[in-house]
């Protein structure tokens, strides 16, 4: 359990806590200890059966989903895991007591076996969603598919059609739709409290250090290896505004985005290509000392530090080595990133309703969306 406690002390942080400008400021409670702040409804009756789940992709997101089984063992049990890393498979095996023949290097190995779980959580990289989703649907698994569903319309349609033909449930991990605040907004709109919706103004503040971690140094920095930022980061938000608009379909879209800061042209004159060796590290807001090492030295190895230690060893020595040699220790102005750091989207819906959305990577706050909904009777 120590592995999971280190990595996910803040799974149930509420939106106010997530506003912190520090990466791991409030990661001082485990999910079990933080039930009052959790998004789950703890008053639900105990279910009559436990859902068995196969986790495909044991990274940060796959592990977060699996942690539900740790907190609620009568509701869910992880019975298999797919991940190419031995350290990840061993941790899952230990925490979830997985049988020897139910952890795999490749999802194809699991898909070739006779069905052994009721559902599968697919948390592979963005561009690797379609093939496992189609394969497991054909085997009769119900599917929780991490967002985005896929990175092309064709792949999305194939996933949906296969699930329909196979008679299995498909849920995409647009988890913000189920947050109490999102549900309350939907409730008020449907009740006509502000009349007919005229316009939605919505901002997603990614957080400056989060953007640097995930979309400059990290896994989502190159469109060819993942997808564009609006898809990888802000599909939550596009899903929300469409959800709030109800049956009104989007008719027109215009969008502009730029990558104007995290470029080689903006690299400080005396900066090094590696952050740990850089002479301007102390004054840089993207210093790995500030984002990772500061908290690790206090014993905190939860996200985002957990992602840096890809070998599964959570100590200062392993973290320092990863920062010295791996992608997360690179200068943010000397990476191979090419995705937008800010983007605006204007949408026109049926009935003349409009939406103005902004994704901004240069904010102090992280994850605290700002939404104003204007209606015919108020806002």
Annotate each language-model stretch with its function.
Residues 80, 119, 199:
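Short, Asp-centered acidic motifs that coordinate Mg2+ and/or phosphate
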Residues 158-175, 195-199:
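Rossmann-fold dehydrogenase core element
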Residues 2-18, 22-98:
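N-terminal Rossmann-like dinucleotide-binding module
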Residues 176-330:
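Predominantly a Rossmann-like dinucleotide-binding segment in NAD(P)-dependent oxidoreductases
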Residues 98-162:
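Beta-loop-alpha module in the N-terminal Rossmann-like domain of NAD(P)-dependent dehydrogenases
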Residues 325-379:
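Glycine-enriched catalytic-core subsegment of oxygenase/oxidase enzymes
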């Amino acid at each position: 359990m120590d592995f999971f406690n280190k990595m996910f002390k803040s799974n149930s942080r509420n939106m106010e806590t997530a506003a912190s400008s520090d990466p791991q400021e409030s990661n001082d409670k485990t999910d079990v200890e933080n039930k009052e702040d959790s998004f789950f409804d703890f008053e639900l009756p105990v279910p009559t059966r436990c859902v068995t789940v196969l986790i495909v992709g044991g990274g940060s997101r796959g592990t977060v989903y699996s942690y539900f089984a740790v907190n609620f063992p009568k509701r869910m049990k992880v019975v298999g895991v797919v991940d190419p890393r031995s350290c990840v498979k061993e941790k899952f095996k230990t925490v979830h007591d997985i049988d020897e023949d139910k952890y795999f290097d490749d999802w194809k190995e699991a898909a070739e076996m006779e069905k052994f779980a009721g559902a599968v959580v697919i948390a592979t990289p963005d561009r690797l969603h379609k093939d496992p989703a189609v394969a497991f649907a054909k085997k009769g698994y119900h599917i929780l598919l991490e967002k985005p569903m896929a990175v092309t319309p064709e792949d999305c349609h194939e996933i949906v059609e296969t699930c329909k033909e196979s008679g299995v449930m498909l849920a995409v991990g647009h988890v913000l739709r189920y947050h109490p605040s999102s549900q309350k907004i939907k409730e008020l709109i449907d009740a006509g409290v502000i009349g007919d919706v005229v316009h939605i103004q919505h901002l997603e503040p990614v957080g400056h250090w989060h953007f640097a971690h995930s979309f400059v140094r990290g896994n989502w920095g190159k469109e060819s290896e993942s997808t564009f930022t609006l898809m990888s980061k802000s599909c939550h938000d596009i899903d929300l505004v469409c959800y709030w608009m109800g049956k009104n379909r989007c008719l027109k879209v215009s969008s502009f985005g730029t990558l104007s800061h995290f470029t080689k042209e903006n690299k400080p004159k005396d900066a090094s290509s590696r952050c740990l060796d850089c002479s301007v590290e102390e004054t840089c807001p993207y210093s790995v000392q500030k984002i990772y090492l500061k908290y690790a030295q206090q014993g905190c190895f939860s996200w985002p530090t957990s992602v840096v230690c890809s070998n599964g060893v959570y100590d200062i020595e392993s973290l320092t080595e990863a920062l010295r040699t791996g992608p997360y220790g690179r200068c943010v102005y000397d990476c191979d990133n090419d995705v937008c750091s800010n983007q605006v989207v204007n949408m026109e819906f049926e009935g003349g309703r409009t939406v103005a959305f902004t994704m901004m990577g240069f904010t102090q706050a992280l994850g605290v969306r700002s939404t104003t909904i204007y209606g015919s009777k108020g806002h």
